[in-house]
């Protein structure tokens, strides 16, 4: 899969302009939140700028920050990898919808090791993040990698320092595959990490792993590839070693029942070559739009992304949503996103 080598900055900005009423009217949108989808949002915004002239400014500040900003009405849309509960959505008057499917991978810095050479399973990975496995040549790791020469090197564990949807996805997986992690740490955008150096954003973790020999850190796949980081294979729910690819992220989503809720948990799914740490990512928007022109432009941007952004997402190794899910999202926009008079914005 061809990977775009664009550097992902913390602030992703693109310039666009389009209006239903005048080609000279400029629409400017602001969004903030998850760093997990920031590479594809950057690419979409850049292309949308060239095609329409509209402005979209997206700040990758972490999912927790995105939720806070949309609740505070300081942005036009928020972004989070951790879906809000139905109760929280109702309380804040928000609607959430998915955009793309991606994967969290384990990036490692072991001298001489290439991507896909090291295999880990969920139990072993959890024990690393619990601080129980401290060296790369530990017996548990060696057993999964017969024939691979592992260094007697300390493992430098890297995790997120900020509230993070990527952490939510990662800890959701660990809670399914490591009983001690489930009982003592649990799942969340922020947890009480047993050990580890904290990095801000996916790019912060990638930078730590790049600098620290012996490091391991969890990042969205595009960040590992853009930073030329080696990443591991994982043992799937079917007991097979699998690689992170756009196709295998899509495989993890095949069994999901999207008709009941958009908030699907795609971690540790069974299915041919399903990547174990797969997730969709979400946009948050107010249902009752006080500035309907802004709400309309948000929907236009993501409608455009659904129609024309699939190849760009795939080039960055995200999987597109199934067409049936996109149609469900559009139908939900019509019934949920309205102006103060109750008129649908889509």
Curated annotation (Swiss-Prot):
What upregulates or represses it? By phosphate deprivation. Positively regulated by PhoB and negatively regulated by PhoR.
GO terms for CC? ATP-binding cassette (ABC) transporter complex, substrate-binding subunit-containing; membrane; outer membrane-bounded periplasmic space
A GO BP entry: DNA damage response
Its primary localisation, in coarse terms, equals: periplasm
Q: Where in the cell is it found?
A: Periplasm
**Keywords for this protein:** Periplasm, Phosphate transport, Signal, Stress response, Transport
Q: GO molecular function, one example?
A: phosphate ion binding
Report the leader peptide range: 1-25
Binding locations of phosphate: 34-36, 63, 81, 164-166
Q: Does the keyword Transport apply?
A: yes
Give a yes or no for keyword Signal in this entry: yes
For this UniProt entry, which segments traverse the membrane? Answer: none
Lineage: superkingdom: Bacteria
Family annotation (InterPro entries): ABC_phos-bd_PstS (IPR005673), PBP_domain (IPR024370), Phosphate-bind_PstS (IPR050962)
Q: Cite the record's note on assembly.
A: The complex is composed of two ATP-binding proteins (PstB), two transmembrane proteins (PstC and PstA) and a solute-binding protein (PstS).
Q: What is the recorded function of this protein according to its Swiss-Prot or TrEMBL entry?
A: Part of the ABC transporter complex PstSACB involved in phosphate import.
Provide the family line: Belongs to the PstS family.
Name the UniProt record assigns to this protein: Phosphate-binding protein PstS
Recorded source organism is Escherichia coli (strain K12)
Top-level taxonomy: Bacteria, Pseudomonadati, Pseudomonadota, Gammaproteobacteria, Enterobacterales
Name of the encoding gene: pstS
